[in-house]
């Protein structure tokens, strides 16, 4: 199973690294391939607090994950205005087993329409944003 993480400038490091740790443990047990990073901008984006990452792929590369994690960070609110990024998420989600957001990664998924008619939640500070979307059921 291919499990990839979307990264971008100003990604929240904890959202990315915490989940990466769990998937890495699964990979060590042979339950999935080693996780990979797909960048939305440069191949070496910086996180919210300055941590640098080295991407395995750019979102324009022809790769298809089985599972895609979309971590949060202030950069998500910038990336959600890029139509190419939104189209990438829509197209990739069609062939994914699962697409998961962490915290404000939900901005990207919501903009791509991936939450329609689903139950969703996020960090309490961002619930009001989700509640404005009448196509989703917000779980607190």
Set out the residue ranges of the language-model regions.
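Short loop-to-alpha-helix "cap/lid" segments that border enzyme active sites
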Residues: 132-134
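Anionic-ligand binding patches
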Residues: 120
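Class I SAM-dependent methyltransferase SAM-binding "motif I" and its flanking Rossmann-like core
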Residues: 124
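Extended, subdomain-level signal for the structured scaffold at the beginning of enzyme domains
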Residues: 1-99, 106-110, 117, 128, ...
């Amino acid at each position: 199973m291919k499990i990839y993480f979307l990264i971008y400038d100003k990604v929240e490091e904890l959202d990315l690294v915490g989940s990466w740790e769990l998937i890495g443990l699964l990979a060590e047990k042979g339950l999935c391939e080693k996780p990979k990073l797909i960048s939305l901008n440069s191949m070496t984006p910086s996180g919210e607090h300055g941590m640098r990452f080295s991407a395995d792929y750019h979102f324009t590369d022809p790769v298809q994950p089985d599972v895609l994690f979309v971590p949060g960070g202030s950069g998500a609110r910038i990336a959600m205005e890029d139509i190419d990024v939104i189209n990438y998420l829509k197209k990739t989600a069609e062939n994914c087993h699962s697409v998961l957001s962490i915290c404000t990664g939900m901005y990207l998924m919501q903009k791509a329409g991936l939450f329609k008619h689903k139950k969703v939640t996020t960090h309490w500070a961002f619930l009001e944003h989700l509640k404005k979307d009448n196509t989703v059921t917000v779980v607190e």
